[in-house]
């Protein structure tokens, strides 16, 4: 029970990581017309979750958890470097690195433990968000599959929240989209919690290009 509550707290909208400031390119997708209602939002989120950063982040989270559990500092540093390198644009790099550092700092202060202190000492500088979450969960002994599932659901929730602010999608429709994607998150977590870095890969080229376009978008409220 305590592990589930810990994950809920760490990945809640109130956790001080600044998730509200990022849309992962969704703001540009709305601007260019790719996302214009609940149906197109669901399609866009499904692609990101199953073929883009959602899937990759869940794998990276699992890898970080595994490295901490094995006390493999070199692998932990290497997987963080890889996670940062996979960010396709400056804004998406900022999105993951700012949230990652904020998450680890907040968790180390509020939920300190010797293993997490060791992790923090190894991961100085830029830190990818899924690495921070996986490493913290591994340090606290939280189950890997539950961690990956919770991370994946929070990823989708944050983007649905962003959509409510920039897309013609109401709260009821947004909640329905989230509900429709929850079984996919669970299915992915069941598989990806055991995956390694060889399973990484994405096919969301339009989103990646959109994240570049967002840097010069005329009117915007998000940092990505």
Swiss-Prot record:
Family statement drawn from the similarity comment of this UniProt entry: Belongs to the UreF family.
Signal sequence region: none
Superkingdom assignment: Bacteria
Subunit field text: UreD, UreF and UreG form a complex that acts as a GTP-hydrolysis-dependent molecular chaperone, activating the urease apoprotein by helping to assemble the nickel containing metallocenter of UreC. The UreE protein probably delivers the nickel.
GO MF term (any one): nickel cation binding
Organism of this sequence: Methylorubrum populi (strain ATCC BAA-705 / NCIMB 13946 / BJ001) (Methylobacterium populi)
Annotated InterPro entries: UreF, UreF_sf
Name of the molecule in the record: Urease accessory protein UreF
One cellular component (GO) term of this entry: cytoplasm
Subcellular location: Cytoplasm
Keywords (A to Z) from UniProt: Chaperone, Cytoplasm, Nickel insertion
PANTHER family assigned: UREASE ACCESSORY PROTEIN F (PTHR33620:SF1)
Function: Required for maturation of urease via the functional incorporation of the urease nickel metallocenter.
């Amino acid at each position: 029970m305590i592990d589930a509550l810990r994950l809920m707290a760490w990945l809640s909208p109130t956790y001080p990581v600044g998730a509200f400031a990022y849309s992962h390119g969704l703001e540009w997708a709305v601007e260019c017309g790719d996302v214009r209602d609940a149906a197109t939002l669901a399609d866009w989120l499904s692609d990101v979750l199953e073929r883009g950063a959602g899937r990759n982040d869940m794998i990276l989270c699992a890898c970080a958890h595994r490295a901490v559990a094995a006390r493999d500092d070199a692998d932990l540093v290497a997987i963080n470097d890889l996670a940062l390198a996979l960010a396709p644009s400056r804004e998406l790099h900022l999105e993951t690195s700012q949230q990652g550092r904020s998450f680890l700092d907040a968790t180390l202060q509020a939920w300190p433990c010797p293993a997490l202190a060791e992790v923090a000492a190894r991961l100085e500088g830029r830190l990818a968000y899924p690495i921070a979450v996986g490493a913290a969960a591994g340090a606290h002994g939280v189950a890997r599959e539950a961690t990956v599932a919770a991370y994946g659901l929070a990823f989708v929730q944050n983007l649905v929240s962003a959509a409510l602010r920039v897309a013609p999608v109401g709260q009821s429709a947004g909640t329905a989209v989230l509900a429709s994607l929850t079984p996919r998150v669970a299915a992915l977590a069941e598989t990806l919690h055991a995956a390694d870095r060889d399973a990484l890969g994405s096919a969301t080229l339009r989103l990646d290009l959109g994240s570049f376009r967002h840097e010069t978008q005329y009117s915007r409220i998000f940092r990505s």
